[in-house]
Amino acid sequence: MSLGNLTFGFFSILVSSHAHAGSNIKSQQIFLVAGLLIMIAALFDGLDGPLARKLGVQSPLGEQLDSLGDLTTFGLAPGALIYQMYLSDLRIPLSFSVFPTFLPLGLAISAIFPICAAYRLARFNVTHDNKSFVGLPSPVAGLFIAFIPVTAYNDAPVPLPYALALFIAMAILMVSNVKYSKPQSTLKPHFTIVRLIAFAALVGFLMYLLGWYWVIFFVVVLYIFSGLLAFFIHLLQRIRVGFDKRFRPGERDNT
């Protein structure tokens, strides 16, 4: 499964390289395929852990392959996708130099995402928390970026400023200290067979009604904001406690 993840991520990079920044139909179709390949790779990545635990074939080698696959699919592939979609023509001319004649600003910006993904995965490999992730998981960040060409093909293209802002925001969240819950640890104790069937039926109905990509996109966005909301609530609580200790020490001592 890890190799399937890596393979489809590599396919996405190759497909992205055959398109060019612009709004023509052919390029949009190529970018759509590149985004869908990232989603297929995410399916392999999602099945990898449960299958390994079910079959009892977990190993250090598998963990390393999983990290390399995630870096390819959710780090390099989204960076290549956004570069080809928006940044390949973003250059700063250099009149004072013979070689090169321009500064490839687009290349530098697109490299931010794989750099942050690599750091995020390396940090995950050396610091384990059974209940939560520190920083946005790279598969979620990569999936979010993969939806940009999907929404652009089915609806309206995402303007360059918004696409870049989202691209950089996802990269920053990966290396942030924002904590995200592990769905398998949080939801598993509350799921029964009946609830699982009901949930699957609801998801299937929503996919039929709204379109599969909007349902998955909503789940991804909901997960991203869940960590941010918890982070800001915790931050406000710390500020309030610090305020009480500094400006109302007497009240706290009398309680």
Give short role names for the model-derived ranges.
Residues 1-46, 219, 223, 230-234, ...:
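Topogenic membrane-insertion module of multi-pass membrane proteins
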Residues 1-3, 35-36, 54-120:
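Multi-pass membrane catalytic core of lipid/isoprenoid biosynthesis enzymes
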Residues 1-12, 73-77, 140, 144:
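The first (N-terminal) embedded transmembrane alpha-helix
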Residues 7, 43, 47, 51, ...:
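Active-site His/Glu-centered metal-binding helix of metallohydrolases
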Residues 11-35, 79-108, 148-163, 209-214:
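Helix-coil boundary and interhelical linker segments in multi-pass alpha-helical membrane proteins
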Residues 131-255:
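C-terminal membrane-associated helical module and adjoining short loops/tails
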